[in-house]
Amino acid sequence: MADSSGSNPQSPGFTEKLKSWLCWSWTYICALWFAMVLTMVYVLRSPLKLQETVNAASVFLNTLTPKFYVALTGTSSLISGLILIFEWWYFRKYGTSFIEQVSVSHLRPLLGGVENSGSAGLFSSVNGDAEPRSNVAECKVWRNPLNLFRGAEYSRYTWVTGKEPLTYYDMNLSAQDHQTFFLGDTQQLRPEDSVMQKAWRERNPQARIRAAYQAIELNRECAAAYVLLAEEEATTITEAERLFKQALKSAGKDTNLVVYIKRRLAMCARKLGRIKEAVKMMRDLMKEFPLLGMLNIHENLLEALLELQAYADVQAVLAKYDDISLPKSATICYTSALLKARAVSDKFSPEAASRRGLSTAEMNAVEAIHRAVEFNPHVPKYLLEMKSLILPPEHILKRGDSEAVAYAFFHLQHWKRAEGALNLLHCTWEGTFRIIPYPLEKGHLFYPYPGCTETADRELLPSFHEVSVYPKKELPFFILFTAGLCSFCAMLAMLTHQFPELMGVFVKAFFSTLFAPLGFFADKMESFMPSCLWHQLTNV
């Protein structure tokens, strides 16, 4: 056993050396084989009647009219144009080149290539140590802590613009959340619970509302039905608050229902301007149910405290939740950056900073901004109003465009209120990308940026919104190649049609120049080798 264990480390090294030697030798064998084929073709040109074939081909080409060349180049331009259109459509939809994907996925394994682990960056920690992190974990979808009310807010947007702000995928996730949260114990379903279970799955809002009223007819104390009516039928926040209070009376001791309803009541108070009341309700909720931290109620609290401009209380909440062991969010990172930027932004000047350098406080603020931008690089474009905002989705993808939309929608006003904070952000946020030149492979303070955010964000955000992509993808080689080929063929077709004789002279000169090295090589071979040897070889 000892011998076998001792020989194992040497085996992989010998195997790798053998493989590299075979690859090296195979390259030269292929080159030698190609040279031998060319030599044999030249030697056997008389038995194979290659000269006669070439002469016949040249006669045929000389008899072709310019119209043939126009048709040929026009057809080539059309085909390459169709390929270009398909490649561009595929790239816009899936973010990759179709030809490149087929080559890597199907042709490369057949040719013996080893696939690079494209997701290797997703498994690397900040220090470069590999960790078993899967794409599913990286692209986990979270409930938006500040999600709007469908009836009182989302529906108003639809009435005004005629556009649907929520996708079916997003609403389907919400339906699953509600079924799990309110009807977790499927073994003891009451009749009204069965009705509500179907109601959450309905796509049509009116069908959901009718099912909620049906559940109330079965049981006047059905809290889940009042929750649905408050979320979807109430057209004002005041009406939604009244229905939530009715639901709270009927919730009894159902912890999930109580937490959900109290949180939404606090959000109603926040939207109606009773901010201190909302803060008190959120604090009480966090004290009463400390184990429900995954609901991210502290993000609601942070936003309300920022509205009160209670920055000391905001810092206290951050000190508790901005911990290395807890999952981060854009709210945590950017609120921390806002507090540090606020302390120096009113006196910050890029010209003065370039002359005297950054002070310690300014350096801390810049580092906090870099940290926030590394976590979610999409947020600054919305805060700086370089991209238009839309209504946030009900679910977000951390570090994705959906989270950036949700954060900026509620926090843009707080950044504007801090004098000079947006100016400091504008001057420094792009410096983050110099720290992390390859964000998909290695991060600086966080894990490498997940490569799956674009696909998930396209499912969460409506189609009329242009999803922000990071890092910005360059056009694949095959799109550029087909564009050049299409343009070149079209130009040749036009020139051949306009100047047929001149293009004919040009084509003949081009091919004469192209085959001149082959003729020179053949003459040298004939002068180098004895004529009797060629005669004997051709008679074999």
Swiss-Prot record:
- Name where it's found: Membrane
Q: Does the keyword Membrane apply?
A: yes
TM region positions: 24-44, 68-88, 475-495, 502-522
Tell me, in one coarse class, where this protein mainly resides.
membrane
Key words of the record: Membrane, Transmembrane, Transmembrane helix
Q: Which GO terms describe its cellular component?
A: membrane
Membrane topology per the record?
Multi-pass membrane protein
Family membership noted in the UniProt record: Belongs to the ST7 family.
Q: What is this protein called?
A: Suppressor of tumorigenicity 7 protein-like
Name the gene that codes for it. st7l
